[in-house]
């Protein structure tokens, strides 16, 4: 069974983990009601998507 020849240093470990992070979600303003919403998703406030009402309130 293969084992590491040398111990991985703190710096080497942290440099490897710099890419393992959470991203900020892409928020845009709804053109219909002006609320902030996730892009490419139905607006939770007014229920519209691409100018059409998808969810009736």
UniProtKB/Swiss-Prot annotation:
One GO BP: translation
Keyword list, A-Z: Ribonucleoprotein, Ribosomal protein
InterPro entries named among the record's database cross-references: Ribosomal_bL32, Ribosomal_bL32_bact, Ribosomal_zn-bd
MF terms (GO), sorted A to Z: structural constituent of ribosome
GO cellular component annotations of the record: large ribosomal subunit
Assigned protein family: Belongs to the bacterial ribosomal protein bL32 family.
NCBIfam families reported in the protein's UniProt record: rpmF_bact
Name listed for the protein in its UniProt record: Large ribosomal subunit protein bL32
Organism: Exiguobacterium sibiricum (strain DSM 17290 / CCUG 55495 / CIP 109462 / JCM 13490 / 255-15)
Gene name tied to this protein: rpmF
């Amino acid at each position: 069974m293969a084992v590491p020849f040398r111990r991985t240093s703190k710096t080497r470990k942290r440099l490897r983990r710099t890419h393992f992070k959470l991203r900020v979600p892409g928020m845009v303003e709804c053109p219909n009601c002006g609320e902030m919403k996730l892009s490419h998703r139905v607006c939770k406030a007014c229920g519209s998507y691409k100018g059409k009402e998808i969810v009736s309130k």
